[in-house]
Amino acid sequence: MPLLDSFKVNHTKMPAPAVRLAKVMKTPKGDDISVFDLRFCVPNKDIMSEKGTHTLEHLFAGFMRDHLNSDSVEIIDISPMGCRTGFYMSLIGTPDEKSVAKAWEEAMKDVLSVSDQSKIPELNIYQCGTCAMHSLDEAKQIAQKVLNLGISIMNNKELKLENA
């Protein structure tokens, strides 16, 4: 079975928080779809809390759209990684990593400004599959850590696994 692209990079060398352009694909009509690795935690060293990750999932995509979407960029989806060390963001267009990092930073500031749990979008039994599994406090802790550490840019060449 062929390796997925995410398993072709050396996770022991990944910095965090950091942005990595994981892939660019062309649609049949010629549009670019970019996939970004938004790494919140150093793999195998740290992990985002379950409730904090879930709450970020509800907040992050909307805030990133506010700061990154434009005439040439439209976010399709932002989803948490199963390992809980980050999120994958798929979008139409090819923004540079610095623009993505700036939008991510602004989105984390937005998370810190959410006044209370009732302000989390889609936090109800009709729109969320596990609506009891949220923590705004934990999401804010994750956001504050990102802001405190600063967001860097990953270099794919430095991360490439030898035989992948």
Swiss-Prot record:
GO biological process: quorum sensing
Recorded name of the encoding gene: luxS
Enzyme Commission number(s) from the entry: 4.4.1.21
Protein name: S-ribosylhomocysteine lyase
Cofactor note: Binds 1 Fe cation per subunit.
Catalytic activity: S-(5-deoxy-D-ribos-5-yl)-L-homocysteine = (S)-4,5-dihydroxypentane-2,3-dione + L-homocysteine
Summary of the function given for this chain in its UniProt record: Involved in the synthesis of autoinducer 2 (AI-2) which is secreted by bacteria and is used to communicate both the cell density and the metabolic potential of the environment. The regulation of gene expression in response to changes in cell density is called quorum sensing. Catalyzes the transformation of S-ribosylhomocysteine (RHC) to homocysteine (HC) and 4,5-dihydroxy-2,3-pentadione (DPD).
Pfam families named in the record: LuxS (PF02664)
Keywords assigned by UniProt, alphabetized: Autoinducer synthesis, Iron, Lyase, Metal-binding, Quorum sensing
Binding locations of Fe cation: H54, H58, C128
GO MF term set: iron ion binding; S-ribosylhomocysteine lyase activity
Similarity comment text for this entry: Belongs to the LuxS family.
Domain of life assignment: Bacteria
PANTHER family: S-RIBOSYLHOMOCYSTEINE LYASE (PTHR35799:SF1)
Cofactor: Fe cation
Assembly with partners or alone: Homodimer.
InterPro entries named in the record: LuxS_sf, Metalloenz_LuxS/M16, S-ribosylhomocysteinase
Phylogenetic classification of the source organism: Bacteria, Pseudomonadati, Campylobacterota, Epsilonproteobacteria, Campylobacterales
